[in-house]
Amino acid sequence: MALAKRIIPCLDVDNGRVVKGVKFENIRDAGDPVEIARRYDEQGADEITFLDITASVDGRDTTLHTVERMASQVFIPLTVGGGVRTVQDIRNLLNAGADKVSINTAAVFNPEFVGEAAARFGSQCIVVAIDAKKVSGPGETPRWEIFTHGGRKPTGLDAVLWAKKMEDLGAGEILLTSMDQDGMKNGFDLGVTRAISDALGIPVIASGGVGNLEHLAAGVIEGHASAVLAASIFHFGEYTVPEAKAYMASRGIVVR
């Protein structure tokens, strides 16, 4: 039987508050990530991804406290990323209740960190987040490069080869964001999603660009992703998770 495809709402959190606005009805405090995560859990989301965009070091304790609160009230897998640079960072997040930890920039600067983390904690809880941008011109063979610092700094690393290297080092999952599409609401970059999904044997989560339910379905059908991640279409109440699952099922996709 085909593995069920996952739907994963994403929360961007700064100093313990959700920052990409949330306009759910019936939420007393739109900024509290725990309340929002509970809503998604009740709606039947498969997982929650929590990206800590707090730049300051002192924000870390707030983050751990938020993760602890979330883990005590939300009973679906929780992935936490943002500023993860050391084995101790990973241990702290897992101890706070995260199920998986996402590594982004630190993997670029020190790829062996991914191998060390996978060896220490198991591949099943190590996610590598990749921010990719298309660098090939019209008529050229499509090529995507890894960027860091929120898509501002090119690394010269080929995104497909890099993802393969991360898998070889022990990553259990790739969270792939297209920097070209992020926030544009006109769909995933299906080219890079498919290229990486087809090259790897581990799950790829497609992220960046969802504006409607067809975009979610296309990420799976055309992008070959194992899971699809979205923020604003769920946060603003445009669609609910059950609506997304029903739509994907209507397109022949196996959902939980």
Curated annotation (Swiss-Prot):
Function, in words: IGPS catalyzes the conversion of PRFAR and glutamine to IGP, AICAR and glutamate. The HisF subunit catalyzes the cyclization activity that produces IGP and AICAR from PRFAR using the ammonia provided by the HisH subunit.
Any one GO molecular function term: imidazoleglycerol-phosphate synthase activity
The species this protein was found in: Pseudomonas savastanoi pv. phaseolicola (strain 1448A / Race 6)
UniProt entry keywords in alphabetical sequence: Amino-acid biosynthesis, Cytoplasm, Histidine biosynthesis, Lyase
EC number: 4.3.2.10
Catalytic activity: 5-[(5-phospho-1-deoxy-D-ribulos-1-ylimino)methylamino]-1-(5-phospho-beta-D-ribosyl)imidazole-4-carboxamide + L-glutamine = D-erythro-1-(imidazol-4-yl)glycerol 3-phosphate + 5-amino-1-(5-phospho-beta-D-ribosyl)imidazole-4-carboxamide + L-glutamate + H(+)
GO CC term, one of those recorded: cytoplasm
Active site annotation, chain numbering: 12, 131
Subcellular location: Cytoplasm
Pathway assigned in UniProt: Amino-acid biosynthesis; L-histidine biosynthesis; L-histidine from 5-phospho-alpha-D-ribose 1-diphosphate: step 5/9
Protein name per its UniProtKB record: Imidazole glycerol phosphate synthase subunit HisF
GO BP annotations, alphabetical order: L-histidine biosynthetic process
Keyword match Lyase: yes
Main location: cytoplasm
